Amino acid sequence: MSKLTIPAGYKTPLSTYEMQRAIEFIKSNFQVNLGQALNLRRVSAPLFVEENSGLNDNLNGVERPVSFDIPDVGATGQVVHSLAKWKRLALKRYDFKPGKGLFTDMNAIRRDEEVDNLHSVYVDQWDWEKVIERQDRNEQFLRQTVRAIVGAVAETNDALQIAFPSLHTVLDREVYFVTTQELEDRWPDYTPKERENAICREHHTVFLMQIGDDLKRSGKPHDGRAPDYDDWSLNGDIIMYNPVLDSAFEISSMGIRVDEASMDYQLHKRGCDDRRELPFHKMLLSGQLPLTIG
């Protein structure tokens, strides 16, 4: 059942027609701002991948991808959940060099998504990935990238309000960095979502770090993360305070991606050792894929 909520007395400041114009404006402006901030080039994205390639995003490990047979090639296609792993392989195939990356306007179907104000069965999102050096696999580089993304979002918002004066969204460019363990230590009796809401009410733009591994108090992860793309020690969510919903509003789930060692640990930790035999995972564990952030 949908958990959609509409605050009492809420009215959108734009007509349906204006809303479509604003969406077009955001998309055209943000892709330029993001590309310049992170040195990215736009590429085309697949709608589906081959089932046994290991390229689809397993999300939390329980979501069922939309699948269909392709008789002419004797394979099964899966509509993507995200392009987290496909992008890394694309960077290798397209021969991107360190410091450069790609972005794409991704469409996906997540049939088992819990639908609410922020989540839909249909996904339309920017997906990006960038080649890095091994020495870039650190928290300082992660924070630097987060600040660049927040800057691109804020610049898009500034331009949007000039084009559509009835919009008055205020975004805080100052990012507050905090780990999931620090939130659990501060609010041990809160649910993960309640912790996110609480910290966003205090600091309106937050990067919540280290999502996926088990927390010390509860023994459970703050939120689910697949073991084969993000390095759980070097990832996080950019979340902003949404005054209309009075809640945290996730705008980006991102991170420095697994290398050979962190993927080995995370696959074993989550009981996913069977994935080691998939083509993507074999390439990564043998060092054939570039190190990336995305």
What residue ranges belong to the model's regions?
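Generic recognition of stable, solvent-exposed alpha-helical segments in well-folded globular domains
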Residues: 18-21, 25, 29, 137-144, ...
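A translation/RNA-centric and nucleic-acid-associated enzymatic feature enriched
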Residues: 179-294
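A glycine-rich phosphate-binding loop feature that marks nucleotide/adenosyl-phosphate handling sites
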Residues: 47-51, 165-172, 211
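Class II aminoacyl-tRNA synthetase-like tRNA-binding/catalytic domains
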Residues: 2-119, 127-131
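Hydrophobic/aromatic-lined pockets within catalytic cores
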Residues: 31-42, 147-158, 212, 216
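Flexible, active-site-adjacent loop/turn segments at secondary-structure boundaries
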Residues: 66, 101, 107, 116-121, ...
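Extended, charged alpha-beta segments that form solvent-exposed binding/catalytic grooves
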Residues: 99, 104-197
